[in-house]
């Protein structure tokens, strides 16, 4: 099972890594550097994990919809920067930095992720 690994340091670079390499790739990120891990890119079912210096976010593609993992019901929209772009995101969907990678490491049982975690419309 492979994952696309994108890093902005400061320019964008991308490579394919094995799921077993995700934890080490995450740990090797220099301080202050953004990364995105994408499983099953451009397919009906996909998982995208953006890791930022202060937080992570997880987006799931499933059943022709996108879902953002949430850890609270706080729907206040906040401005965030992911990679080189600015977004607004529900505060309750901003996760602890390590959590995104922990979710990604469970992707081999993709369907169970939808039931194990809480999700908001993405």
Predicted regions mapped to residue ranges:
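Acidic, proline/glycine-rich low-complexity IDRs
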Residues: 1-33, 55-122
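Short conserved beta-strand and strand-loop elements enriched in small hydrophobics
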Residues: 35-37
């Amino acid at each position: 099972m492979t994952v696309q690994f994108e890093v902005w340091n400061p320019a964008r670079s991308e490579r394919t890594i094995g799921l077993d390499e995700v934890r080490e790739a995450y740990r090797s990120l220099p301080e202050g550097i953004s990364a995105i891990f994408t499983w099953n890119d451009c397919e009906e079912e996909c998982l995208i994990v953006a890791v930022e210096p202060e937080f992570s976010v997880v987006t799931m593609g499933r059943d022709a919809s996108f879902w953002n993992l949430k850890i609270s019901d706080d729907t206040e929209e906040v401005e965030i920067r992911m990679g080189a772009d600015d977004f607004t995101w529900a505060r309750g969907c901003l996760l602890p930095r390590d959590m995104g990678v922990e979710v990604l490491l469970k992707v081999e049982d993709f369907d169970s992720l939808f039931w194990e975690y809480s999700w908001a419309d993405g």
